[in-house]
């Protein structure tokens, strides 16, 4: 009992220190503006199983060719696929910086403003099928697309490659993959203590399934809402590599995670645990690819990011020292530069094909 009391007191002290530290950080740096408030032209895409997917399109300024595109043979559309427990707002910094291009953002099923799917429909393969419908809806005809995926969003792109390999090298002209892997998540996350990592990893799907069932789901949701500063600390630790990341950015990530129901976290957690997309990497290699990995990623082991880049013949890898899993929020300048570089490679390939035609 004394140990429990001491542990509780320690948690309170830790929470107070976090709150004080957060206040000091706010005083030192200016908060990013309008986090999650950028909006585009809304569109609803209905999946084959009846789930409404919320899509937003940002058109570039009228009659303006992006200065960074030397050869724009066709209007290029970049489609962004967000990660597990997040929504399209996580691309805030990319949306703000890449507006000279035609940008498409969507909430994956069961996330953000998209609808809930039936029990058993939470699978990575289903997300790949959804992405195919998004492409058809927002980039009809021969309009080329570049796909960008963070974490689970990268696996969504891999699932599309498995289902529709013919799109890559024709419709899909480039791919950007951030903080993701093709397999190996069942080996556990880097933050888990090494000796007990296999045990924790095997137990995780069972724990999530139990937490999402019946009255337990209500208890878990209540606990999540009351977590306060301790939730802030865990989000900062798991999501970011730099402990000095602005607290407004940590809060932004935390709010997205909190808005995801525990049932969705459970269902897609199991799907991610079992994912193996290694057979799709040859297909991705048909187009220019850039992969990005933070060396402080505590959710997807950086070694898996290295393996991914090595397995894709056309991949260029961007290694980001000090960055964690939420790379798109923590190192947006690096991510934006990598995407811009990918577009330049796509354009160079298109120009070369035109010259040889």
Model-found features: residue ranges?
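Conserved hydrolase catalytic core segment
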Residues: 143-191
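Conserved alpha/beta-hydrolase catalytic His-Asp/Glu region
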Residues: 212-283
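Short beta-strand/loop motif that positions the catalytic acidic residue
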Residues: 284-285, 291-293, 297
């Amino acid at each position: 009992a004394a140990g429990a009391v001491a542990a509780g007191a320690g948690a309170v002290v830790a929470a107070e220190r976090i709150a004080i530290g957060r206040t000091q950080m706010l005083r030192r740096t200016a908060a990013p503006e309008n986090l999650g408030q950028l909006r585009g032209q809304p569109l609803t895409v209905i999946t084959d199983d009846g789930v409404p997917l919320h899509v937003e399109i940002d058109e570039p300024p009228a009659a303006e060719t992006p200065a960074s595109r030397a050869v724009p043979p066709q209007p290029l559309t970049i489609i962004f696929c967000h990660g597990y427990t997040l929504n399209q707002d996580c691309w805030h910094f990319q949306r703000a910086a890449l507006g000279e291009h035609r940008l498409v953002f969507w909430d994956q099923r069961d996330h953000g403003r998209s609808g809930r799917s039936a029990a058993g429909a939470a699978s990575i393969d289903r997300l790949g099928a959804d992405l195919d419908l998004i492409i058809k809806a927002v980039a009809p005809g021969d309009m080329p697309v570049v796909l960008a995926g963070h974490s689970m969003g990268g696996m969504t792109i891999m699932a599309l490659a498995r289902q529709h390999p013919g799109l890559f090298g024709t419709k899909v002209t480039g791919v950007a993959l951030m903080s993701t892997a093709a397999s190996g998540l069942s080996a556990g996350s880097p933050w888990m203590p090494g000796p007990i990592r296999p045990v924790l990893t095997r137990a995780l799907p069972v724990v999530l399934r139990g937490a999402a069932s019946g009255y337990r789901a209500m208890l878990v949701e209540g606990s999540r809402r009351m977590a306060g500063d301790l939730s802030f600390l865990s989000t900062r630790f798991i999501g970011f590599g730099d402990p000095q990341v602005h607290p407004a950015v940590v809060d932004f990530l935390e709010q997205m995670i909190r808005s995801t129901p525990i049932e969705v976290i459970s269902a897609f957690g199991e799907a991610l645990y079992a994912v193996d997309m290694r057979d799709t990497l040859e297909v991705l290699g048909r187009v220019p690819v850039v992969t990005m990995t933070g060396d402080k990623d505590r959710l997807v082991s950086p070694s898996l990011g290295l393996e991914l880049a090595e397995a894709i013949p056309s991949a260029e890898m961007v290694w980001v020292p000090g960055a964690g899993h939420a790379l798109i929020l923590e190192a947006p300048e690096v991510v934006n530069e990598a995407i811009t570089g990918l577009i330049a490679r796509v354009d160079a390939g298109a120009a070369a094909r035109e010259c040889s035609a």
